[in-house]
């Protein structure tokens, strides 16, 4: 029977549209019994293909196509693995090829268990016969286009290439080839249909008729192919001279003594201490027993050794994270810095003897020192025993559109116009087409664009090239090439299998996570030590520090890991955390799912809502979180306390619910109800508690992880509370600079005016004053910045230009410095300096080498010119520095309209409020009914914000809207996608004007009603009240728009009202 052995999958990058799952499903449906893959240049899909084929009861056959030079000829050989030995030789051959070994003689010793396929182009070469003696078998691969009268010097084998599964995909393949080759797609070219997977009968009929022996050869070959994969975990030995179980026990015992000494449990003997001591010792014994029983002794020694090396090199790796923080062994070995006994964290959540799985210890490290730890692993275990893991860059929606559009001849301008319409929140092109009306309208403009969209949608998500997994590293006892093909990479070799496959074949995977926040802590520590002569050990920071807790209570958490979101900051202000556990709760509940319980959580914390008692047996478990199961550990405790489950079994229940494992879940549910009954609970109560567990198990967060990451956030916040200068200087290097500068300003910092004599290369912060750095000035190269700092000071602009080397003697190198005010100390008229620079009086030419250098010596005579306006100065600074140093025009308006608007940072959901803002961007949108509405992006010089104008309001105010202008905008504050926005009903320009609204009243009888009406019409005109009976006039702080509707609303309450 025919078998498609030469199927190229999508991992033959841009050379096939065949997805592995689709291929197996189609082959099964068409009646195949045997299927193969033969990707070009790699084995990325091999292991996954074998496992999935077996689920379809299909016989899988693995092969690979590689170019090797044989007798001076570059030949695209295909290598079929006939058995397990052949599969391992495929791994070796592929690895050798990846490392540049491209001579056939380089692989001749690795052809056992291999069937060699030679392209029919070389089938008549007499020397081919010698290849049959090198490999187990050698064949000439033929297909339907092979000359039926051809004579070959080796046996033949049906080997047609398969690159698509549906006939319509042949065009997609042709376009993919155009993308791959960087050429335009030519529709006039005939598209071949012989690479379509057909029914087996079609191939059999053809080959029986023309090449019957080839079909027999295929049947004989496939009949003897089978693989046996040993998927048993093969952990590398940490120390081949010692038994790992003894070594681990010794290290853990010593580590426990050291940890207990830190807690004074060994030095201060008392009955309480002895009781605590026994808790630690018993738990350590229990954990060591489970670790050995599951075969992970070496694993713990390997990870502990790596963390020990990190400490020796002063690489701060944080507190540890994830469920590993629940292990006492991990704590005493220094893998984590969280005491699981003290904080009631569970080992079973990490390593469960009732659930056989690899322990998952993720190692966090500063991202700028990750390479050092990779190098240590390479040197410690050998370069052929350690590798990073491959991942794939796939065709995203933007790239897919660009690639296909280019193949169809679109210009760069057209491509940019099309891709600019894409919106990030819509994940795929199909989502864009469904939800982005502007994009859909563009696509439907003509048939060509519609076709480009359809093709791009089909190839979206396909792998385009390899990349390196952000964190995964694998280790093996034997050489890795016995398990997986490798390719060279920057730090370590790179596996050809992705992470799930690497773990499935029994390799140890450790995640080396480079965290920017650990880099920030390390840099903060270094800067504080250098400046303040204080060495802050992050692990010794008091997690109950009151100044730091006050920072969280105020929601002053910009720059703090996991606490920067505006909604999180608002939540913190409502929560008012008073202890570190509150911080852990906050980061754990503020997630999709459990965040729905935040209002109850806050209300119960402050006594505004009663905490329900579901059952006395679990009330103490839920008491710390006010009756809400935030944590997975609580779910396990409830199952243990209520139904008598072991913690291991409780963890199985939690996992079964969260992963929705049907049959397993049903059995565990019955076990829970039965066990609860044996514990004396009624069926009704047991079902109530089970339903409660089921509800929260979908949302529950790992408290071990929450504690470790809460501690990391607290450590960063400690520096913000106690060393704010150093905090902001480091954050300005590593974060969104504009955001952090604004945060510093809100915390009482000032920005120093730029001065060419005082600026450094980078930003500098001291005594709550920020000196912006030259490296951040747009248009100033690092080399120029370095020269400026090395040659300070300068008397004035002329002195600076005179000293400037010829290679920097350009207007574009100097004008930005004038425009940010770097020479204001000598002459504050920036307009005059810019005027004289080059365009008119040619200050640059005056100080060039060949002009005027022998002048009379009186110096350059400046021509007078008008200075920039304050708004122009602000705009130049904003564009060139990222922030305006000159007061923003809105600040003057804010003083004028104080009390008439609410700052963006203080908006409250579901309230009608007025904001004073600048319009940055106006986007119109046509509704399904054909009406036009608008979305505005506005800012108050500190924060950006979204404003929505529905059609009726847009019609009313569209003529007044202009980007770059200032407005008072009123409406209802709502929430969308977890972000606040304003749905407006009134817009009024914010103007500096002397025109006022004068209201004449008899007395103050209607003051409250008048004030209420006036505040519905915010605008630029100050309200003046004259009381005729009281003979007094009051200048109010209320400003209103000029409006006939307002005047009509005031009728009956005032004698007269006039604008003048």
From Swiss-Prot:
Query: Which is an annotated GO molecular function term of this record?
Result: nucleic acid binding
Leading EC class? transferase
Record's Gene Ontology CC terms? cytoplasm
Top-level division of the source organism's lineage: Bacteria
Record keywords? Cytoplasm, DNA replication, DNA-directed DNA polymerase, Nucleotidyltransferase, Transferase
Q: What is the disulfide pattern of this chain?
A: none
Q: Which reaction does it catalyse?
A: DNA(n) + a 2'-deoxyribonucleoside 5'-triphosphate = DNA(n+1) + diphosphate
Localisation per UniProt entry: Cytoplasm
EC number(s) in its UniProt entry? Answer: 2.7.7.7
Report the record's Gene Ontology biological process terms: DNA replication
Quaternary structure, per UniProt, is: DNA polymerase III contains a core (composed of alpha, epsilon and theta chains) that associates with a tau subunit. This core dimerizes to form the PolIII' complex. PolIII' associates with the gamma complex (composed of gamma, delta, delta', psi and chi chains) and with the beta chain to form the complete DNA polymerase III complex.
What is the annotated role of this protein in its UniProt record? Answer: DNA polymerase III is a complex, multichain enzyme responsible for most of the replicative synthesis in bacteria. This DNA polymerase also exhibits 3' to 5' exonuclease activity. The alpha chain is the DNA polymerase.
Which family does the entry's similarity section mention? Belongs to the DNA polymerase type-C family. DnaE subfamily.
Q: What is this protein called?
A: DNA polymerase III subunit alpha
- Source species, please? Lactococcus lactis subsp. lactis (strain IL1403)
Lineage, opening ranks: Bacteria, Bacillati, Bacillota, Bacilli, Lactobacillales
Name of the coding gene: dnaE
